[in-house]
Amino acid sequence: MEKFLVTLSTGAASIAVLAVLFTVPSLYNTINEVHDEVLDGVSVFRVETDSAWTEMMDIQITVTPPTKPRVNPFNSIFRQKRQTFSGLPAWCQCEPTKPTCPPGPPGPPGQPGAPGTPGAPGPKGDDNTATFAPLTCAPVSQDCVKCPEGPAGPAGPEGPAGPAGPDGQPGAPGNAGNPGSDGQPGAPGDNGQDGAPGQDGQPGAPGQDGQRGSGAPGGPGAPGNAGPAGPAGQDGAPGQDGQPGPAGPAGQDGAPGNAGSDGQPGAPGGPGLPGNDAAYCACPPRSAVFVSRH
């Protein structure tokens, strides 16, 4: 058993050493390749940035006007330092603004452009030549669907009472009761109908002439019954128009209409106004490129 373990350990150690011997050179070569690629990229970037900086300095020199020199109030007291840049002017020539400064605010939007001209109609499409097999539907069964019986439902509520049964047989007559006492006299009956009027009697003998009375006149008699209604009068003139009534409540909003078709796209607007300066960037120190240009 010990021999087997020693042999296994030795074999594993040998394999590990061989793997290290093959892996280390490969890693070394990979690291060197990456190092060379990084150096090449840095060199190319440096060449491009130097070329861009030189072009920017040329544009700055030809476009930007020179600034006025600063007046030092101590020039009359202290001795001025000699200028080492003999080819440069006596004032500060600032370099162009670095791109680290924040840009200005965007300009206002331009006016909408005129609608473009409609495009030419496209060519006629090809006819559809694809054919499809006829669709066949499975026959529909007209048999009733047989569902399995469900479980028994709960007991229903008690029903209403049934109808009354038939009358029973009449019972035997009872014994005659004792005669009752006399009742109270009843109320008088209604008056009978009036009889027919009798025949007119013979006219009486004329009476003696009466004497004119000398008493005061009697009072006015009771007012008579109202007479029949008179004919309807003519229609009166139409009355004036009444004041207008208050405004009624506003009706409910109607349903929204269908959306209209999209309009033609407008032409591109004009260029916006230049934005304001966001911040002031101090002038960087003079570089050797600027000195070499002068």
UniProtKB/Swiss-Prot annotation:
Q: What is the lineage of its organism?
A: Eukaryota, Metazoa, Ecdysozoa, Nematoda, Chromadorea
Region Disordered: start-end pairs: 100-133, 149-278
> According to the UniProt entry, which residue ranges have a biased composition of type Gly residues?
210-224
Which Pfam families does the protein's record reference?
A: Col_cuticle_N
Organism of this sequence: Caenorhabditis elegans
Please, one GO biological process term?
larval development
Q: Does the keyword Cytoplasm apply?
A: no
Q: Where is this region: Triple-helical region?
A: 102-127, 153-274
Please state what the protein is called. Answer: Cuticle collagen 10
> Which stretch is the leader sequence?
1-30
